[in-house]
């Protein structure tokens, strides 16, 4: 069952697979480095209640 216009032994499938993996990795990184810090920033309403390091802010435990 060869696809029309495919050459090189399923190179189209390999390309789609690589692109899919890259998209998944980028989505995971975006979630951890953008979404998580934003969710943590919402927890602290006042600036003096926040503690920030490495770009991620969270409510002070003390």
UniProtKB/Swiss-Prot annotation:
Alphabetically ordered keywords of this record: Disulfide bond, Late protein, Membrane, Transmembrane, Transmembrane helix, Viral envelope protein, Virion
Induction comment: Expressed in the late phase of the viral replicative cycle.
Superkingdom of this protein's organism: Viruses
PTM comment, free text: Not glycosylated.
Localization per Swiss-Prot or TrEMBL: Virion membrane
GO cellular component term of the entry, any: viral envelope
Membrane topology term: Single-pass membrane protein
Transmembrane segment boundaries: 16-36
Family: Belongs to the asfivirus inner membrane protein p12 family.
Assembly behavior: Homomultimer; disulfide-linked.
Protein name (database record): Inner membrane protein p12
Gene source species: African swine fever virus (isolate Tick/Malawi/Lil 20-1/1983) (ASFV)
């Amino acid at each position: 069952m060869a696809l029309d216009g495919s050459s090189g032994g399923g190179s189209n499938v390999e390309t789609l697979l690589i692109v899919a993996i890259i998209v998944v990795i980028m989505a995971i990184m975006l979630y951890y480095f953008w979404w998580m810090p934003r969710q943590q920033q919402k927890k602290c309403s006042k600036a003096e209640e926040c503690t920030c390091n490495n770009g991620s802010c969270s409510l002070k435990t003390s």
